[in-house]
Design a protein with these regions (language model features):
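Gly/serine-rich nucleotide phosphate-binding loop at the start of the catalytic core
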Residues: 1-63
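Generic alpha-helix structural propensity
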Residues: 24, 36-39, 52, 56, ...
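Conserved aromatic-histidine-acidic binding/catalytic patches
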Residues: 29-32, 36, 45, 118, ...
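Hydrophobic, Leu/Ile/Phe/Ala-enriched alpha-helical segments that form helix-helix packing faces
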Residues: 32, 48, 79, 166-170, ...
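Short, conserved catalytic/metal-binding motifs centered on acidic residues
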Residues: 44, 86-98, 130, 177-186, ...
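Electropositive, glycine- and tryptophan-enriched low-complexity nucleic-acid-binding patches
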Residues: 55-59, 112-176
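Active-site-proximal, Lys/Arg-enriched surface segment
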Residues: 60-138, 257
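An internal, acidic/charged active-site-proximal segment
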Residues: 145-261
Length: 261
């Protein structure tokens, strides 16, 4: 097999997911992948990889149809790299739409670089992405799913739906898949939602979180008064409160490309 045969087969399958205005949508995808950030979609029509006019671009956006389920199946069957167990990252990205007051179903979300009235909160749309990662030191990821998170939806519930759907589409090869989440997710809700799913979850905890052990660990129960409700305190930012670990895992710190766990 020639080196580019796999890429050619993938692009052919990708084209098969574009059911209406397929040629225009396919060139639009190439333009997005090869262009620098642009202020508006029409600027993509100036890219060399986009051989059509701006009218064709807007017609594709308005009338084009993409088979989303077929596209998800295609991405799930093309892993980023061979590994013992696949690793996926789940996170939310916000598209600010502060000035689009007539846009439907805008919500208010945290944004690290955009502010409104002095607060890091913006009006816009939230999208939750699932991307495959590898333990190789590189900047590439492989997005496998994206869903719009509506204002009346909760990110942990949407994440559970995405993970279960991905497990059903992906070939069960290698080890148990690992899904990593940022600190904005609730590990208890995720564990309850994915309890019967063949996967592992890893959630980053904020440094300011505190936990309390079982009351029986705090010593013998008091003979008077209300029984203890909490045991020893575990403060994530205070090592003096940490008990003896039951297991240890050493992480490799790579400042140039981030920290690997």
């Amino acid at each position: 097999m020639r080196p580019y045969d796999a890429l050619h087969a993938f692009r052919h399958s990708l084209y098969g997911c574009l059911h209406r205005r397929g040629d225009a949508l396919f060139e639009l995808i190439d333009a997005i992948l090869t262009a620098d950030p642009v202020p508006a979609p029409v600027h993509l029509s100036l890219e060399t990889s986009h051989r059509r006019g701006w009218g064709s671009l807007y017609a594709a956006l308005r009338r084009g149809r993409i088979d989303a389920e077929a596209l998800r199946d295609l991405l799930a069957h093309h892993p980023l790299a061979e590994s013992e167990a696949p690793v996926y990252a789940v996170d939310v990205s916000v598209w600010p739409r502060c000035d689009a007051e007539s846009s439907p179903q805008r919500g208010f979300y945290y944004h690290p670089s955009r502010h409104s009235a002095g607060q890091p909160i913006v009006a816009g749309w939230a999208y939750q992405f699932v991307a495959q990662l590898t333990f190789v030191r590189e900047s590439w990821t492989a997005p496998v799913d994206a869903l719009r998170v509506h204002p009346d939806q909760e990110v942990n519930t949407v994440a559970t739906v995405q993970v279960e759907a991905l497990l059903g589409r992906s070939p069960m090869e290698g080890g148990i898949p690992l899904f990593v989440f940022d600190a904005g997710y609730d590990p208890v809700k995720l564990q309850q939602g994915l309890e019967s799913s063949p996967c592992q979850i890893l959630v980053r905890l904020r440094a300011g979180r505190c936990f309390y052990g079982d009351p029986s660990l705090a010593g013998p129960p008091a003979t008077t008064g209300r029984p203890r409700r909490h045991g020893p305190k575990f403060d994530c930012k205070d090592p003096s409160t940490w008990p003896e670990p039951t297991a240890e895992h050493t992480c490799e710190d790579a400042p140039a490309t981030g920290r690997y766990a």
